[in-house]
Amino acid sequence: MCLNIFRTFKSYFGCNITFVPKESALVGIGGCIGSVARYQINEWIPSLLGTFIVNVLGCIAIGFLMYESIYFGAFSRNSRLFLGAGLIGSFTTFSAFATQTIEAGLFYGIIFIAANILCGLMGVFIGRQIILRGRRSWNI
């Protein structure tokens, strides 16, 4: 089954993308649980400490899940989709960032860290500027 949006994407970019309902549902359900868990932790422990705790817990969880899967095959693909891409992915995106940084090695890892921090800060600044300038021009 291929949705129209994916057909358009395929014809424009030449990519073969298909919609897989079961796998998408696993990621979506896990994502729902992870985002609610993150919200609750940040309600209980507001400020940077809550975010720090969420990120560290997410890194521990993704490290356990992925490396347990790689070395011991302990989790099925569906479990990795539900837990990794869904639950942990929505709980924190920092866990994926940390895993990819370690796997990149020292040189590329440093570049990856610097680029993510710089681009992340620039993205927040640009988004903020769009809103601030838009509000002024829209008289909101």
From Swiss-Prot:
It is found in: Cell membrane. One of its GO terms (molecular function) is metal ion binding. Na(+) is not transported, but it plays an essential structural role and its presence is essential for fluoride channel function. One of its GO terms (cellular component) is plasma membrane. It catalyses: fluoride(in) = fluoride(out). Na(+) binds at residues 89, 92. Belongs to the fluoride channel Fluc/FEX (TC 1.A.43) family. This is Fluoride-specific ion channel FluC 1. It comes from Methanospirillum hungatei JF-1 (strain ATCC 27890 / DSM 864 / NBRC 100397 / JF-1).
